[in-house]
């Protein structure tokens, strides 16, 4: 058992904007987000398009994030609209500016467009008598200035504030919940299934279930050394988190020690393996171009092919010779994908990530590669980059992008994969 008296007990807030995309879209149309049935859909012209957000009233009909357009009932009281990413970003920035009235920038961590952390340990007492009263004040200001409802988790650390918000605050009438170290046995440990916990996926859950671990309490009490032996550093983190311990600080989140450049895509229909390869090539083209724009080369490649049902294939590989050329990356990805992927399966998600960068001019010459040909490939790639920058990303494309499987041209002009 851990001694919580030795741990720092801070006042960390996790703030989530309720049904953010749907709420912003409602407010823009002069509608009440809590009374309107509205869905924000990636592309209203495609029946397989994913629902990005739904208002609470629409969720009562079973439509939620991840549903498909064709699942939404055809009713006159249901609004179906495309996203407006520029508007969402503007509102998100406005909310962050409200938070920054009370704390310095280093005490705020933007977790996503609609969720952020604040460490108010050293500041809340200047504005309110208690942390809870401060949260009420902040929620009220955000609503009055933007029309957005928020839920707030208060915790001794980032982990507890996040789980307090996810598990309890969203269901409380006032939208606020507070979890401290002393609440761990009564609030954290009963959580099940395990995948409802912040850091556990279905695959890890299945492995834990085989060991008789079904609740977070079971995980917290399981011998630490066995978790470490089976799961490595993940096992260490799981045991600490199951006991409510998270020693990361909001301020430390500004220090990016191992940045990566990545791209992922949810496909609009089920793809066969050969079709999925086309989209993967398009994703690789994008990330390779972004690496070149930074004048870097990448050493580590991580990719994933996700099946339409559960599961999929993911692999990480570290190159001996770092690169920023699409053909090098694609060759590595396909080498492993051809061996690991189920050719009869259908695919719905793809992702590619590059990391472990060094400067382009620090790459060592290789005796086993035609450096003259490589220079020509680099010049060609950078020429295409310049054309894309000057005109558009659609000015030069591979033939496969014009096939039925290609998605590049359908995504031109989108921000974060969605319409502006």
Show where each model-derived region lies:
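Residues that scaffold, gate, or flank divalent-cation-dependent active/transport sites
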Residues: 1-113, 117, 242
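DNA-contacting surface of Y-family translesion DNA polymerases
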Residues: 5-7, 14, 206-347
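Acidic, metal-coordinating catalytic segment for phosphate/diphosphate chemistry
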Residues: 24, 321-420
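Short acidic, glycine/serine/threonine-rich loops at helix termini
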Residues: 24-27, 50-54, 160-168, 232, ...
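Short Gly/Ser/Thr- and Asp/Glu-enriched loop/turn motifs at secondary-structure junctions
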Residues: 111-115, 155-158, 296-300, 345-349
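Short beta-strand-to-loop capping motifs
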Residues: 118-122, 321
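Long, highly charged, low-complexity intrinsically disordered interaction regions
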Residues: 130-193
């Amino acid at each position: 058992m851990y001694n919580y008296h030795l741990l720092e007990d801070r006042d960390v807030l996790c703030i989530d904007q309720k049904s953010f995309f749907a709420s912003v879209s409602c407010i823009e149309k002069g509608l009440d987000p809590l009374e309107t049935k509205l869905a924000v859909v990636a592309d209203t012209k495609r029946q397989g398009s994913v629902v990005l957000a739904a208002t609470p009233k629409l969720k009562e009909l079973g439509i939620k994030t991840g549903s498909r357009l064709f699942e939404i009932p055809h009713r006159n009281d249901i609004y179906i609209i495309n996203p407006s990413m520029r508007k969402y970003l503007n509102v998100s920035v406005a909310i962050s500016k409200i938070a920054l009235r009370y704390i310095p920038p280093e005490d705020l961590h933007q977790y996503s467009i609609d969720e952020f952390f604040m460490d108010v340990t050293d500041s809340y007492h200047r504005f309110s008598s208690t942390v809870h009263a401060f949260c009420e004040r902040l929620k009220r200001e955000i609503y009055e200035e933007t029309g957005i409802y928020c839920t707030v988790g208060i915790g001794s650390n980032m982990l507890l504030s996040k789980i307090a918000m996810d598990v309890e605050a969203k269901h409380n009438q006032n939208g606020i919940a507070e979890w401290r170290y002393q609440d761990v046995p009564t609030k954290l440990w009963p959580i099940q299934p395990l995948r409802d916990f912040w850091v556990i996926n279905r695959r890890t859950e299945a492995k834990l279930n085989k060991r008789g671990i079904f609740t977070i309490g079971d995980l917290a009490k399981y011998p630490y050394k066995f978790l470490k032996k089976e799961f490595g550093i993940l096992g260490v983190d799981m045991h600490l988190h199951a006991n409510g311990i998270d020693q990361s600080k909001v301020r430390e989140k500004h220090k990016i020690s191992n940045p990566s450049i990545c791209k992922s895509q949810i496909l609009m229909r089920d793809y066969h393996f050969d079709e999925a390869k086309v989209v993967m090539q398009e994703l690789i083209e994008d990330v390779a171009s972004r690496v070149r724009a930074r004048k870097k080369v990448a050493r580590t490649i991580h990719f994933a092919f996700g099946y339409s049902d559960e599961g999929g294939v993911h692999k990480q590989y570290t190159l001996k010779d770092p690169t920023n050329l699409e053909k090098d990356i694609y060759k590595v990805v396909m080498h492993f994908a051809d061996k690991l992927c189920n050719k009869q399966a259908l695919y719905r998600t793809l992702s590619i990530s590059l990391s472990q960068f060094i400067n382009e001019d620090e790459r060592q010459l290789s005796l086993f590669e035609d450096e003259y040909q490589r220079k020509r490939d680099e010049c060609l790639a950078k020429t295409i980059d310049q054309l894309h920058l000057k005109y558009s990303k659609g000015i030069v494309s591979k033939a496969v992008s014009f096939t039925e499987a290609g998605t590049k041209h359908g995504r031109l002009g989108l921000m974060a994969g969605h319409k502006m």
